[in-house]
Design a protein with these regions (language model features):
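N-terminal chloroplast transit peptides
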Residues: 1-13
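N-terminal accessory scaffold of Fe(II)-dependent oxygenases
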Residues: 14-276, 284-301
Length: 301
């Protein structure tokens, strides 16, 4: 009887091991030429990574970021502080709470300076403090998320010129564009966009997981049913950014034991890399490592 139990346990463990799956890699385009992009990505509405480092020479890559002594990406505050009075959207979050505020760009930059007013930085976090600089207990993280390029000073917009494939692959209609800045870890929950999306990494590293429209909708609907939620699938809603819904979505998308691993595409993005996300494809994004991360994206059609 003991031998039978041992064999049964071993078989169960073997089955569990052999059925473990991993996400598939996002295909990489042969080159970054417009015809290639149209033929192999845009027209068939297929996720694709442009050749690595295609946008490494984009001005923002070198102007907005520096390398510290540990070769980690940091903000070039001397350059960016010139536009400190610009009002930007910030997300303040921790495991259980999330809120959005609008503050000056200088307020955001100060959150990455040790001992700054109302904010204190450590080497491996972007902890936000709501009281004096001698406070020692972190309360949340600060992320400049989805700041429209149209609301930024012209000089900063010029640092992230719109790529040719955005302007010429389709109708030439750029629906919107945004900047994303924050020290890892950063997080965007599972959602889908109403238009095709070109996502360019400027600094640091991000990992993206994608699901086709049918699978992604199934994941989202499953989580909403389990938690009794009613979130929008196309908005970065507050209910998706903290608490029960965030944890449930994150588990289905990112947990190694998730049943959706085999239905997932995954890519790690570094500075200069660009990912095409077709309309309707569900995706979730994480900033990883200890670097400052920076990204820009364009929604177009």
């Amino acid at each position: 009887m003991l031998r039978s139990r041992v064999l049964s346990t071993a078989k169960a463990q073997c089955r569990q091991y052999t059925t473990t799956s991993t996400p598939k890699a996002v295909p990489i385009l042969y080159d970054a030429a417009l015809p290639t992009f149209q033929r192999d990505a845009f027209e068939p509405a297929t996720p694709a990574l442009l050749p690595r480092r295609t946008f490494l020479e984009m001005p923002a890559v070198k102007k907005w970021f520096l390398k510290d002594a540990k070769d980690n990406s940091t903000l070039n505050t001397t350059y960016l502080a010139k536009w400190g009075s610009t009002i930007v959207p910030l997300e303040i979050s921790n495991d259980n709470d999330f809120t959005r505020i609008e503050q000056s760009f200088s307020f955001f930059l100060d959150s990455y300076v040790p001992g700054a007013r109302a904010v204190r930085r450590t080497s491996e976090s972007n902890d936000f403090f709501t009281s004096a600089s001698n406070t020692t207990t972190p309360t949340a993280q600060v992320y400049l998320a989805q700041a429209p390029l149209a609301d930024l000073p012209r000089a900063l917009v010029n640092d992230v010129p719109t790529p040719e494939i955005v302007l010429k692959a389709g109708k030439g209609d750029v629906y919107d564009s945004s900047i994303w800045l924050g020290r890892a870890p950063t997080y965007t929950p599972l959602h889908r966009d109403p238009n095709p999306n070109l996502f360019v990494q400027l600094a640091g590293q991000k990992v993206v997981r994608l699901f086709n429209p049918s699978i992604g909708h199934g994941i989202f609907a499953k989580v909403q049913e389990v938690i009794g939620g009613s979130a929008s699938a196309t908005m970065r809603g507050e209910e998706m950014m903290a608490g029960e819904e965030k944890k449930a979505l994150e588990a289905e998308v990112w947990d190694k034991t998730s049943s959706y691993q085999d239905d997932c595409l995954e890519v790690n993005l570094h500075a200069g890399d660009a990912l095409f996300i077709p309309k309707g494809w569900w995706h979730s994004i994480k900033g990883i490592g200890n670097d400052m991360t920076g990204s820009v994206n364009w929604w177009f059609r």
